[in-house]
């Protein structure tokens, strides 16, 4: 997992043989997860990557760009100008397990506070409701969904809430997973 603020840790206990094989990682060694994709370092590279993805998919699939909640106005603007179809803004309440507790609990902007600047960016570009806006990070209840939609999101994304609903409310390490 990644945080919107830097590197995420993937601890050796999380890297089972199956995960090591899927991700081509050595088992038994703590790993760092980069906060950005190595194929781009700026907005021009993002546009190139989006075009590359469009070619690979024959222009038949929507391109989603997920941004952390650090600079929602500017990152939404960049993603729209680069050609994204859908922008997912992930606020600080997202349920990552791959970083230190101090980051999980104290760093980033609250999810709903990220929404208004992202909507404003879309409105300023004349793209609100043209480019879809999805908000994620700590959306747990119907009231959270209603607030997000009322503030201008087209959809919400849930993660931890769905896991809890499925009975996974006691996260623990499973040696045989």
Task: Kindly label every feature range from the protein language model.
Residues 1-7, 11:
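Single conserved hydrophobic/aromatic residue that forms the stacking wall/gate
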Residues 16-19:
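ATP-dependent carboxylate/acyl-activation modules
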Residues 34-177:
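Glycine-rich phosphate/ribose-binding loops and adjacent secondary-structure elements
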